[in-house]
């Protein structure tokens, strides 16, 4: 993989704690300061020295790369193939969500795909599981979000692996009357693996919908892209009646989330 920074770049670190300055692997310029004050001073120092034309060629190159990535993504978003591509699932979820919905995304591939394709329009209405190590928090986050905002639509988009870590909280939703919708990107194993040689890759398409149904949830199993939206609408009807819902969507196990259009990323 290429380095994240140009080897010739000068790297600076601003930290309010003097003891933290040299904890980074490499620091060329260390500044002990309040970051807000220091950045204000840097902006003032750069005034008139940097204009939009300064980095125009770089911006043009990025814009061209972004345009090609947008075109690639658009093809996948409209893909009707089965098993369903995770980006197609994300498109259906994004189109379905209310503008003020609370969206929780948790998993590996689906977390990255969700960041690339599902916008959020209201501050503090999107919750992610974060970078590595926190997988499984999606469903509990969704429960908390619905309790905090009972009048808002709350949807949790899970990978099947991350869902399994706290799947029993569907029972919590039923017992305590927390009507959220959980959508599972069911790719049948841990992470995408086009070569099929990773341990834990082929665990099968499990019927988490039947488990949720046994708890008392509204639950559906979806295998066709055209059936996603109707299933989401029925889940919303169940939520309106006070019932939690789970939509288990069979997803392409070979789809690996790579960097796509820069301008479409959200956190």
PLM features: what roles do these ranges have?
Residues 112-189, 230:
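Thiamine diphosphate
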Residues 29-30, 34, 38, 44, ...:
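Conserved thiamine diphosphate
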Residues 26-39, 167-186, 258-260:
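A short alpha/beta connector and helix-capping loop motif
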Residues 21-29, 124-128, 165, 169, ...:
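Short beta-alpha connecting loops at secondary-structure transitions
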Residues 1-61, 232-235:
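Glycine-rich, acidic loop regions that bind phosphate or pyrophosphate groups
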Residues 63-140, 145-146:
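Active-site diphosphate/adenylate-binding microenvironment
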Residues 18-22, 28, 38-39, 111-112, ...:
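Short gly/pro/ser/thr-enriched loop/turn and capping motifs at secondary-structure boundaries
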Residues 1-2, 210, 225-267:
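Glycine/aspartate-rich loop-and-adjacent alpha/beta segment that forms the canonical ThDP
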């Amino acid at each position: 993989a290429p380095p994240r920074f140009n080897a010739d770049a000068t790297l600076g670190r601003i930290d309010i704690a003097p003891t933290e300055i040299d904890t980074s692997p490499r620091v060329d310029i260390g500044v002990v300061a309040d970051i807000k004050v220091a950045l204000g001073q840097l902006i003032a120092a750069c005034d008139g020295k940097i204009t939009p034309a300064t980095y125009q060629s770089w911006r043009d190159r990025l814009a061209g790369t972004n345009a090609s990535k947008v075109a690639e993504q658009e093809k996948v978003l409209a893909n009707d193939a089965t098993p369903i591509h995770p980006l197609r699932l994300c498109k259906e979820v994004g189109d379905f969500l209310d503008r003020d919905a609370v969206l929780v995304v948790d998993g590996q591939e689906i977390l990255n795909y969700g960041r690339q394709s599902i916008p959020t329009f209201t501050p503090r209405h999107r919750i992610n599981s974060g970078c590595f190590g926190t997988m499984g928090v999606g469903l509990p986050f969704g429960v908390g979000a619905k309790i905090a905002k009972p009048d808002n639509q709350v949807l949790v988009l899970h990978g099947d692996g991350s869902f399994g870590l706290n799947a029993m909280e569907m029972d919590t939703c039923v017992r305590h009357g927390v009507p959220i919708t959980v959508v599972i990107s069911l790719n049948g194993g841990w992470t995408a693996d086009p070569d099929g040689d990773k341990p834990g890759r082929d665990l099968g398409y499990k019927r988490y919908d039947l488990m949720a149904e046994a708890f008392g949830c509204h639950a559906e199993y979806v295998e066709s892209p055209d059936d996603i939206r109707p299933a989401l609408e029925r889940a919303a009807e169940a939520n309106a009646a006070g019932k939690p819902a789970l939509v288990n969507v069979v997803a392409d196990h070979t789809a690996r989330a790579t960097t796509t259009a820069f301008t479409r990323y959200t956190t």
